[in-house]
Amino acid sequence: KGRCEKPVPKINMKPFTKKIVLENGREFYGYGFGADREVINEIVFNTSMVGYQEIMSDPSYTDQMVVMTYPLIGNYGMADEDYETKTPTIGGMIVREYNDSPSNFRYTKTLNEVFEEHDIPAIWGVDTRTLTRIIRNEGTQKVIITGADTPLEEALRKVREYALPHDMVSRVSCKKRWMSRVPNHKYDVVAVDCGIKYNIIRQLNRVGCNVTVVPFDSTLEEIMAFRPDGVVLSNGPGNPQDVTPVIELVRQLRGKLPIFGICMGHQLISLAYGAKTVKM
């Protein structure tokens, strides 16, 4: 039997609607928001005090359940200019307190509305401090968001039988190249899209770079045809060892152009040069 982290209800407190069950048998009760459906993902945590919009729209969190350690989420809403991708692919979100009445002159939607729009489940009212310590001490594991009345044995069976997805880069990478240009540019850069965040492109533009974004499986010949001054390998989800096209591309680019990697891109460069990557 797993341990149950079920807060003592206050007088007139509405009944819990959802719960999460970890692969280790621990369960935590709370209230659902966003999409009203069951979901199983890998659980991770993020310690940022602000930036939940950038986190939920970061392709690096594809099919992951993100625990937000900062206790108040949703209070400044969602602004159209702050997304890191057009279509968020985060698996879900777990928060301590959710605020559905944002105060921010820039906001256009609430976090709940965006989660509903993109069919992303979330839960609030959870003891995220305890949950984060479990992840820190035991490592990432699978988790389910399910109804509060789902039997523990049933939820555990679903979690333990579920196989986590692979090859997520092909899912989030662009299917055809696109460009982001600036006037009086200084450099031409090719960005290999493994799940690129818009802010990487914005920052490259800011320092005078025209950016051509290409799919992760682009060939050396296709990239060299743009006559770039350098190549950027983006962030992305999943295991970098699965992204063999980019690893091979780095080996072919070696000595030809400057190469810069961010997050997964950095790991892909390391793998191409013979290093090993290990899941933390």
Question: Residue ranges of each PLM-predicted region?
Answer:
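RNA-binding accessory domains that recognize and position tRNA/RNA substrates
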Residues: I11-D188, V192-F226, P240
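Cysteine-nucleophile active-site neighborhood
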Residues: D229-M280
